[in-house]
Amino acid sequence: MAAAAAAAAATNGTGGSSGMEVDAAVVPSVMACGVTGSVSVALHPLVILNISDHWIRMRSQEGRPVQVIGALIGKQEGRNIEVMNSFELLSHTVEEKIIIDKEYYYTKEEQFKQVFKELEFLGWYTTGGPPDPSDIHVHKQVCEIIESPLFLKLNPMTKHTDLPVSVFESVIDIINGEATMLFAELTYTLATEEAERIGVDHVARMTATGSGENSTVAEHLIAQHSAIKMLHSRVKLILEYVKASEAGEVPFNHEILREAYALCHCLPVLSTDKFKTDFYDQCNDVGLMAYLGTITKTCNTMNQFVNKFNVLYDRQGIGRRMRGLFF
C-alpha cells in the first residue's frame, strides 16, 4: 500500500496532476457523501449473467470493449425491490452524449408485459468504472420514464475477486445554490431461484480458460454420445452379419448367432398388455392435466369478463337512476 501511494504521488508530480484534478472534480459531482440508501435491493444472478452476455457479445461484434445499456425489471413492495430480469436497450451518441431510444424501450416493455405481467420497470444498467457525468445524463432520461429508477453498473474489466456490481439510487442535493442530481450507493443481497442455482452452478464449474469443454454437463453429454455412437456401430455390424449369413455371403457361425439372439432377448418387450395399459394411463393423465390447465385458464378469463361486465352494468344502472331523479 505504501509503495502504491508513493507511485501515485510520483505520477502526480510528473505530469499527472491534471488527471488527478479532473478525477477529484468528477467524483464529488456525481456521488453523494454520507447518504444512506432508502430501499432494500435483492439482485438475481440472472441479471448479472444477462449483462455479462450483453457486454461479451457487443465486444465480439465491435472487436473492442464497449459500453452497453439495458433495462432492469422486477418487483417492488414498499421499500423492498427485487431485480429479477433485464433486457437490452438501443442507444445512439449525439455530440458525445448517449441518447436512449425510447420507442424501442416501449416496444420491448410491451413484449415483456405479455410474458411477465407481474414484473415492472425498475431502472437501467450499464458497464464501466465508477459513475461519471455521462451516467447522470442517461439517468435523467430514464427518470422521464419512471420516477426514482435504480442504476446498476457492472465493471467487466476489474481484476478484483469481489462481485464487480454496484447499485445506486439518485438523490437531489443543493450545490452552489443549484439543485444537482447525485448518486447514492445502495447495499444489495443476492436472491436465487432453483433454475438460477442450476445455471450458476454450471457456470461456476467452467474452467478458468473460459472453455466449456471441461464443464460437468459437457463431459456427461460427450460420454453419453460416445456410448450411443459405439452401440449404434455394434448393432449395425451385427445386423449386417445376419443379413450376410442369410444371403449366403458368409458361413453361419452358430455361436455368434446364439449371442445375437440372446442379446435381442435382453431388450425389454414393449408389446405386453401391461405396458399398453400403463402407457395409455400415462397418456390419459398427461392429457387430463393439460385439459385441466386449459379449463382453469378459460374459467379465469370468463371470471374477468363477468367482473368487467358487472362493473359496466352497475355504472349504467347508476346513470339511469341519476337521470330518473332529474326527469
Swiss-Prot record:
Domain MPN, which positions?
41-174
- InterPro entries in alphabetical order: EIF3F/CSN6-like_C, JAMM/MPN+_dom, MPN, MPN_CSN6
Q: Which PROSITE patterns match?
A: MPN
Tissue note: Widely expressed.
Instruction: Using the UniProt annotation, give all residue ranges assigned to the region (Interaction with Vpr).
Output: 211-327
Q: Which UniProt keywords apply?
A: Cytoplasm, Host-virus interaction, Nucleus, Signalosome
Superkingdom of this protein's organism: Eukaryota
Q: Which residues form the signal peptide?
A: none
Q: Does the keyword Ion transport apply?
A: no
Query: What Gene Ontology cellular component terms go with this record?
Result: COP9 signalosome; cytoplasm; cytosol; nucleoplasm; nucleus; perinuclear region of cytoplasm
Q: Name one GO biological process term.
A: regulation of protein neddylation
Pfam families in the cross-refs: JAB, MitMem_reg
Compartments (UniProt record): Nucleus; Cytoplasm; Cytoplasm, Perinuclear region
**Would you identify the family this protein belongs to, as annotated?**
Belongs to the peptidase M67A family. CSN6 subfamily.
Functional description taken from the UniProt entry: Component of the COP9 signalosome complex (CSN), a complex involved in various cellular and developmental processes. The CSN complex is an essential regulator of the ubiquitin (Ubl) conjugation pathway by mediating the deneddylation of the cullin subunits of SCF-type E3 ligase complexes, leading to decrease the Ubl ligase activity of SCF-type complexes such as SCF, CSA or DDB2. The complex is also involved in phosphorylation of p53/TP53, c-jun/JUN, IkappaBalpha/NFKBIA, ITPK1 and IRF8, possibly via its association with CK2 and PKD kinases.
Self-association and partners: Component of the CSN complex, composed of COPS1/GPS1, COPS2, COPS3, COPS4, COPS5, COPS6, COPS7 (COPS7A or COPS7B), COPS8 and COPS9 isoform 1. In the complex, it probably interacts directly with COPS2, COPS4, COPS5, COPS7 (COPS7A or COPS7B) and COPS9 isoform 1. Interacts with the translation initiation factor EIF3S6. Interacts weakly with RBX1. Directly interacts with COP1 and 14-3-3 protein sigma/SFN. Interacts with ERCC6.
Its recorded name reads: COP9 signalosome complex subunit 6
Organism in which the protein naturally occurs: Homo sapiens
